[in-house]
Curated annotation (Swiss-Prot):
Gene Ontology biological process terms, A to Z: phospholipid biosynthetic process
Known pathway: Lipid metabolism; phospholipid metabolism
SMART domains xrefs: G3P_acyltransf (SM01207)
EC number, UniProt record: 2.3.1.275
Compartments, record wording: Cell inner membrane
Keywords: Cell inner membrane, Cell membrane, Lipid biosynthesis, Lipid metabolism, Membrane, Phospholipid biosynthesis, Phospholipid metabolism, Transferase, Transmembrane, Transmembrane helix
Primary location class: membrane
Quaternary structure and partners: Probably interacts with PlsX.
TM segment ranges: 3-23, 51-71, 78-98, 115-135, 140-160
Reactions catalysed, as given in the entry: an acyl phosphate + sn-glycerol 3-phosphate = a 1-acyl-sn-glycero-3-phosphate + phosphate
Gene Ontology cellular component terms for the protein in this record: plasma membrane
One example GO MF annotation: acyl-phosphate glycerol-3-phosphate acyltransferase activity
UniProt protein name: Glycerol-3-phosphate acyltransferase
């Protein structure tokens, strides 16, 4: 019962879509209506409003971090923490408050990993930053980071074995790659947008709705 309650609370925390909330508060277009139509920081950046994108990134990462931190703070066992990690991640992917139309989970996963172990989170985030810096593809950076996160976990804590948190990290990585399946096709076809690109619809929306920021 304790695990179920913790997972439910985590799912509800994850269901808060900061991309939609921040955009609404700042008078910007709904990120689900332009660009990739993904409610995440990268798509919000396409509106031309960097402040909104940063707030979205921080908010999405924070909810992943706080869910796991609270589970640890209340002394829940590792199996409960593992379910909390997965639940907050699933909340972001399929938010009950937004008709189950969520983001791809990169920032939220990063927050979860930082709470699980700071070194694990930082190593994964650094991997994302390096790939994003050199290749300018947010999706490629996310995919590489997702692949390496379980590898970093093994280096830090050994093979998963009976460690439920390690299996949760692996599950999130698999889900994150699956959520990027459309991006994989675009990358292979050379049609993926680079970081900082503004599609016409997004640029128009940003000019009309986000020019005040």
């Amino acid at each position: 019962m304790q695990i179920l309650l913790a997972a439910l609370v985590a799912y509800l925390i994850g269901s808060v879509s900061f991309a939609v909330v921040v955009s609404s508060v700042m008078g910007l277009a709904d990120p689900r209506s332009y660009g990739s139509k993904n409610p995440g920081a990268t798509n919000v950046l396409r509106s031309g409003n960097k402040k909104a994108a940063i707030l979205t990134l921080v908010g999405d990462a924070f909810k992943g971090w706080i869910a796991v931190w609270l589970a640890r703070h209340f002394g829940l066992p590792d199996v409960a923490i593992a379910w909390v990690a997965i639940a907050v991640f699933l909340g972001h992917l399929y938010p009950v408050f937004f008709r189950f139309q969520g983001g791809k989970g990169v920032a939220t996963a990063a927050g979860v990993l930082l709470a699980v172990h700071p070194v694990l989170g930082l190593a994964t985030a650094l991997t994302w930053l390096i790939v994003a810096f050199f290749f300018r593809y947010s999706s490629l950076a996310a995919l590489v980071a997702a692949v390496f996160a379980p590898v970093f976990d093994v280096f830090l804590f050994g093979m998963p074995g009976h460690n439920p948190i390690a299996w949760a990290v692996l599950a999130m990585s698999v889900l994150l790659v699956w959520r990027h399946r459309g991006n994989i096709s675009k990358l292979l076809a050379g049609q993926e947008s680079r970081i900082g690109d503004k599609k016409k619809a997004a640029a128009d929306g940003g000019a009309q709705d986000g020019g005040k920021a």
